[in-house]
Amino acid sequence: MIMRKMTAIMNLAAAAALAGILLIGCSTEADEKTAVTETTTTAAETTTAAGGAAETTEGGALAGKKISVMTPYLTSVTTNQMAGYIKEDLEAEGAEVFVIDTANDFAELASRIENVVSSGTDGIVLVSADPNQVANQLQDAFDAGIPVFGCDSGFIDGMQVNATSDNYQMGELIVRYLFDDLMGGKGTVIDLTHRPHPGVVKRCEAFDDIIKEYPDIKLITEQHVPAEQPINDAQDIVANLLTANPEKDSITAVFAAWDEPAIGATKALQEAGRDEVIVTGVDGNEQAIEMIKDGTNLKATVKQNFEGMADIVCEQMDQYFNGEEIEKGEMYAPAELITQENAQ
């Protein structure tokens, strides 16, 4: 059975069809350097991911299976990591894994799903993408008997499992820490979001629900951050908002629904000398944690267990191809609040 050093017990949640949209391409500053790269080959839609070869297990249920790992966001650091973990684990079990990236193009993602279905892939893993956006193409996979798994995506009927974090709970955790511990229940806040992403939608729903409980906290603006270059775009957005709000203490905090815009916001604040403004994020990527440790404006994030999500997907695929019954729905990997006190 697949096990790549699981670090936590995963909880199974009831199946829930998420109505959100598409996962974020969280790219980090390496400006967006990736560990897994894709090179399209032929009509079979095979794509090769770079990286060290994993030791292969002969004769398992996954041996010889062709698995298509598909995402619109391979430039995202966390998406790239998940795709890499999945590729490594499945190849260790003898599967042939094709990582397919559509570079933020969802029409292309739909087309590529059609191609892998028609070419006879044995399984699909949708990474960091809302299945509602490609529901018709996934239905073709379901009709063809091809199992579809999600990794930090949404879940729709017909899929096997989506491994993710409890995004609403993460939103509650970081928003209450921001409002209570960092803002003291009063002030003004900017919301940096990307509501096409199903996880971000849930985090922002938590923000929207909780801010109603705080009459002394005012939302200045909600700003959409594009997924392609979120650090740079968030930096520009916040720089413009600082120009429009030049007085010290006119902005108390920036809530970023994932770490890349939090990093961009922090850069803008540092350049403007606005040390009084608080920033929080979600994901727990290395650059964000370093900024927290260094005592910058970025004060907290929620660290997701992306490796744990990949482990869940691979274990569930192993069970599926072994003929074992899978309890369909969402499975959650636990998340952790990171502050300067516990940042490592």
Placement of each model-derived feature along the sequence:
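A residue-level marker of the well-folded mature domains of exported/periplasmic proteins
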Residues: 2-12, 25-344
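Bacterial N-terminal signal peptides
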Residues: 13-22
